[in-house]
């Protein structure tokens, strides 16, 4: 009985002294990359919004292994439209870099946005390659999810999506 009482006293002593021995730690303030003094901020944000719009529309592309020639052609036209829009963003960013060549912030941020556009363009080109192979009745292309034609498509679209999220969620644009 005496032993049990001693153990309880020791346990209670430990429980009550631990909070005073260890100093509490607080979460560190998060550091976000800052982009300061953007001279063409409105234009760059508009290009970022345009990329978001195009990306949302890209999700409507529906490629199936049983598309007939007309379906392949129509899907390719949709992709060509998205490529035109993305190349327009790319061109606007190149012009922006020329106009603001002396602004590090503008050069840096426009290159970040260009990375997203380039990733989406490569993904769409991969889809065009798949359509071409489907049109040629390539048996590997008809497997779709088990083929090597969709892997790079998903890789590049996901890469662009991750970069977009990184910019939107973690950049402090001042």
Where are the regions that the model predicts?
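Short, solvent-exposed, charged loop/turn and helix-capping segments
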Residues: 83-114, 168-174
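C-terminal amphipathic alpha-helix
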Residues: 29-76, 119-174
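A general, composition-driven signal for non-globular sequence regions
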Residues: 17-18, 49, 60, 84
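Long, charged/polar, soluble alpha-helical segments
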Residues: 69-76, 80-81, 85-91
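Generic preference for well-ordered secondary structure
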Residues: 5, 9, 28-31, 35, ...
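Sec-dependent N-terminal signal peptides of Gram-positive bacterial secreted proteins and lipoproteins
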Residues: 1-28
């Amino acid at each position: 009985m005496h032993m049990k009482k001693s153990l309880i006293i020791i346990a209670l002593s430990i429980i009550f002294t631990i909070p005073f021995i260890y100093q509490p730690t607080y979460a560190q303030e998060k550091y976000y990359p800052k982009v300061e003094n953007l001279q063409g901020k409105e234009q760059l944000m508009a290009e970022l919004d345009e990329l978001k719009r195009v990306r949302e529309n890209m999700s409507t592309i529906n490629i199936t292994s049983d598309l007939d020639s007309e379906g392949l052609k129509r899907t390719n036209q949709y992709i060509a439209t998205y490529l035109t829009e993305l190349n327009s963003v790319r061109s606007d960013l190149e012009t922006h870099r020329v106009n603001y060549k002396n602004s590090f912030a503008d050069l840096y941020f426009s290159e970040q946005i260009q990375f997203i556009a380039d990733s989406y363009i490569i993904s769409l080109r991969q889809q065009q390659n798949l359509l071409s192979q489907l049109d040629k009745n390539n048996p590997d292309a008809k497997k779709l999810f088990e083929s090597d034609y969709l892997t790079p498509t998903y890789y590049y679209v996901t890469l662009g999506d991750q970069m977009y999220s990184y910019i939107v969620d973690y950049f402090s644009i001042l």
